A protein has these predicted regions:
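Helical hinge/lid and interdomain linker segments adjacent to catalytic or ligand-binding clefts
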Residues: 2, 6-91
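A glycine-rich, often tryptophan-bearing local segment used as a flexible ligand/cofactor-contacting loop or short
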Residues: 54-128, 135, 140-141, 145-147, ...
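Extracellular ligand-binding/catalytic regions of CAZymes and related secreted enzymes
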Residues: 1, 12-24, 141, 147-154, ...
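Short, solvent-exposed coil/turn elements at secondary-structure transition points
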Residues: 34-36, 80, 145-148, 171
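A short acidic, often aromatic-flanked loop/helix-cap motif at beta-alpha or helix-coil junctions
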Residues: 35-40, 103-109, 150-151
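Short, surface-exposed linear patches
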Residues: 22-25, 51-53, 69-73, 97-99, ...
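A general structural signal for short secondary-structure junctions and capping/turn motifs
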Residues: 38, 66, 132-135, 155-159
């Protein structure tokens, strides 16, 4: 688990994921990039990145892409901010087009194959422009999208080399979205 304690959303997300992993009875190694070195990824099968701003990772973003290509699996659990380092891996994430702005997420449609209770739309109270405006290519499998005319992808996976990226793009990090995060994390495993 990679977090950045200087990013408020990273800290809030860790509070939610700590509970998710406890409920899933899943062990986790936490690396706060502000307090410790980023570990060598070779000893891991999965990495969860709880950062929306990847600039502090610098060239580690490229290392993450190379690690996935060799068979690693990564979940970007927070809506990414378009910047230089994210641009380096956009295509690897399955993104074919992106904007610098975010879009409103007031209703999320969940694919019925993604999780129990899927196949319908969920209203989001206190909605705001929380999702990065992107389009994904045919190689990406989209599991959730905005329930509007734009249908912006909110949860998707994209195989890359021998590995896989999973991206959560809904931008909401609260108790009510733990199920979405847990289901997204399960996409990293071979068995759902």
């Amino acid at each position: 688990m990679l977090i950045d304690s200087s990013q408020a959303d990273s800290v809030v997300a860790w509070e939610q994921f700590e509970r998710i992993f406890m409920d899933m009875k899943t062990g986790v190694d936490l690396a706060d990039i502000r307090q410790s070195e980023i570990p060598d990824f070779s000893g891991y099968e999965t990495i969860v990145v709880l950062m929306s701003d990847l600039n502090p990772l610098k060239d580690v973003v490229i290392k993450i892409g190379n690690w996935v290509e060799k068979g690693g699996r990564v979940l970007f659990a927070l809506t990414l901010q378009k910047d230089t380092y994210v641009s380096l891996i956009e295509q690897k994430l399955g993104i074919t087009d992106s904007d610098y702005g975010n879009v409103l997420v007031d209703k999320i449609y969940i694919d019925d194959d993604f999780m129990i209770g899927g196949g319908r739309s969920f209203q989001i109270p206190d909605a705001y422009d929380s999702a990065w405006e992107v389009s994904v290519g045919e190689t990406a499998k989209v599991y959730a999208w905005t329930d509007d005319e734009k249908k912006v992808p909110l949860i998707w996976e994209n195989s890359y080399g021998k590995g896989k990226f999973v991206v959560d793009n809904f931008g909401l990090c609260e108790i009510a979205t733990r199920g979405f995060f847990a289901a997204s994390y399960s996409l990293l495993t071979d068995v759902m």
